[in-house]
Regions:
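N-terminal Sec signal peptide cleavage junction
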Residues: 3-4
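Hydrophobic/aromatic-rich core segments of domains that either
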Residues: 11-14, 30, 167-178, 182-183, ...
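Secondary-structure boundary elements
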Residues: 15, 23-26, 34-209
Length: 252
């Protein structure tokens, strides 16, 4: 996500949206008298042409891997081969590419913006960050190319009370983030394997099923932190010291 300079990025996004332009303009009209939320809407809409996701029957089937593991008791690698044998290897040509600018509805975006602002405004560290930091590291409705869905509320239901209690002990954002990470490690309910990392999973699925490699774990953590109003993003270590590959890491 990059900072949006009106009119260039916003105007381009509205033109690019095609028939969906009316939905995006509804959002802008809705916030016409709220300067901060209007700027947030401009930021999100201006970035939409550069974000997309895929849909398709094969993709939905391939996302069943963890459920197959639970049902059959097979390893992640065995389930991967079974999925590919049943539904075919992942093939983007069988999926439909959908751009955010042409897919996001006014109801979705308004609900998202209102919810994120509601969480952010009650966090004691909100005043320490610029509005630009908020837009970049808390506001986005997606992380990568996962399904388009409203996920924040489910994360807050699961972890919001814990976050509030930690804020009451120490309102420092680093303390709260570290304590949340300690709690997640203590839960010990993440099935660590990259064998099922051949498609992208939504934040709601990762909240319920807790599986995957570095990409999925980073996505889950960023979704959780942002849902709780903790600024967070993903960077990439170019060279993993333990193997010949790069890996994503969360940054606070």
């Amino acid at each position: 996500w990059s900072s949006c300079q009106r009119p260039t990025m916003l105007d381009f996004a509205l033109r690019y949206a095609g028939e969906n332009r009316v939905e995006l303009e509804k959002v802008l009209d809705h916030y016409r008298n709220d300067s901060l939320k209007y700027r947030a809407a401009v930021f999100l809409i201006g970035n939409m042409p550069y974000h997309y996701f895929y849909t398709g029957a094969q993709l939905d089937s391939l996302r069943q891997g963890y459920r197959w593991m639970q049902r059959t008791g097979l390893s992640a690698k065995a389930v991967k081969h079974k999925l590919w044998k049943t539904f075919g290897e992942p093939d983007v040509r069988r999926w439909t590419k959908r751009n955010d600018a042409r897919s996001v509805t006014a109801d979705f975006l308004i609900r998202h913006i209102d919810y994120v602002f509601g969480v952010w405004e009650k966090r004691p560290w909100a005043s320490y960050y610029s509005f630009e930091d908020f837009c970049e590291f808390v506001l986005p409705y997606r992380i990568e190319r996962e399904p388009l869905e409203f996920w924040q509320e489910a994360y807050v239901r699961r972890y919001g009370r814990l976050c509030d209690s930690l804020c009451a002990v120490n309102p420092d954002v680093v303390f709260v983030a570290s304590a949340l990470n300690d709690h997640l490690r203590a839960e010990q309910n993440w099935y660590a394997s990259s064998d099922l990392s051949f498609v992208e999973y939504g934040a709601l699925q990762l909240l319920d099923e807790r599986f995957g490699g570095c990409r999925e774990l980073s996505g889950f953590n960023v979704a959780l932190f942002r849902a709780l109003g903790i600024p967070c993003g993903i960077d990439r270590v170019v060279q993993n010291p333990h193997r010949k590959a790069s890996l994503p890491v969360e940054l606070l």
